[in-house]
């Protein structure tokens, strides 16, 4: 929508990657801002009355986008909307948000709570987050043929694909509260919180990383393409899917390629480095070499 740009000053650097937007305060300071929610994972949380990881989902959806701009989180605000505030639900979500903020050295400085019984029913609610960070002063590194593509493992489905998951549960009449999958409660598997990648990638690491891609809605390929120049050729090898994807495949006819267009498929963050920096990352837990720029 072009009319939005009419509100911009010359300090707005834009949102070229589509992950977070940049605003140049002065020659030394560039701020980045991101906003997101947890989608229909909130509906499952309400049905299961399981909220302890949902605040981390919210913070991670914003902070992982911010990381793609090589920014360090500064402060976070939340928005909570419901029919009426229920103490356990509200408190557990806020505690989870607070805990996640502390994990990435970010301050929860405020928020808004809205009670709207005409819009929300029963236990249902929605949450949104707003995060501001400061961009680290790193050189822009050009992507070249032979560069290596690394993936960092996800922690389950993160916060995307839940409309699809809920549809599977409904059509197959699965009792989500009692179902067991791979020797654990299915509800526990499905509600794992989104990983906070600022905990795994340091400011020093960013000196060697050319681009980062947060793998969210739309899956692996579409999100990866957002972080590289149009027309860049690459080879990605997504070989073995995590066990939780057997739950999807056992209950609906879907190909692995179709899964990569919806889910993170076990990879929550992708980044590119020069091959000479291979040894700096390959031995790390959760890090895997998954491809190459061709």
Model-assigned labels for residue ranges:
Residues 76-78, 129-131, 269-271:
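A structural signal for short, well-ordered beta-strand segments
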Residues 2, 88-107, 120-125, 175-190, ...:
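Glycine-/charge-enriched secondary-structure boundary and capping motifs
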Residues 37-39, 79-87, 112-118, 133-136, ...:
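Acidic, glycine-rich active-site loops and adjacent beta-strand->loop/helix elements
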Residues 1-67, 105, 117-118, 151:
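N-terminal glycine-rich phosphate/pyrophosphate-binding loops that anchor nucleotide-derived ligands
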Residues 12, 21-23, 64-65, 98, ...:
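A generic local secondary-structure boundary/capping motif
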Residues 49, 82-88, 148-156, 185-191:
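Flexible, glycine/proline-enriched loop segments at strand-loop-helix junctions
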Residues 121-124, 130-179:
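Phosphate/diphosphate-binding glycine-rich loops and adjacent basic-rich segments that engage nucleotide
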Residues 49-126:
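A glycine-rich phosphate/pyrophosphate-binding beta-strand-loop-alpha-helix module
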